[in-house]
Amino acid sequence: MQRLCVYVLILALALATFSEASWKPRSRLQDAPSGPGANRGLEPHGLDQLGPASHHRRQLGLQGPPQLVADLSKKQGPWMEEEEAAYGWMDFGRRSAEEGDQRP
């Protein structure tokens, strides 16, 4: 009986995972051409049809994925310092090479 419950649970989770992509509507923003002047020709009534995030996109200036990636790549959070401190001891290959260069 327990094995049957486990199988039913796994089946339900698998169906929920695979069906999630089918019920989400595709955004028309993905089909729009990207580029610096591509979004200038959009009319206000067209922006309302893009979805619930269109109001926020209008306030942000309709940045496309390349601009968002560029903005995010400029930002480094405090987690970068934590990762460097936590994993600094793993950098033994570079350190041993530097030590070998310093010896006469």
Swiss-Prot record:
Disulfide bridges in this chain: none
Q: Which residues carry this modification: Phenylalanine amide?
A: F92
Give the UniProt keywords, A-Z.
Amidation, Cleavage on pair of basic residues, Hormone, Phosphoprotein, Pyrrolidone carboxylic acid, Secreted, Signal, Sulfation
InterPro entries attached to this UniProt entry: GAST (IPR039236), Gastrin/CCK (IPR001651), Gastrin/cholecystokinin_CS (IPR013152)
Chain positions found as Phosphoserine: S96
The residues forming the signal peptide are: 1-21
Could you tell me what this protein does?
Gastrin stimulates the stomach mucosa to produce and secrete hydrochloric acid and the pancreas to secrete its digestive enzymes. It also stimulates smooth muscle contraction and increases blood circulation and water secretion in the stomach and intestine.
- What is the protein named? Gastrin
- Organism field: Canis lupus familiaris (Dog)
- Top-down, what is the taxonomic lineage of the species of origin? Eukaryota, Metazoa, Chordata, Craniata, Vertebrata
This chain is encoded by the gene named GAST
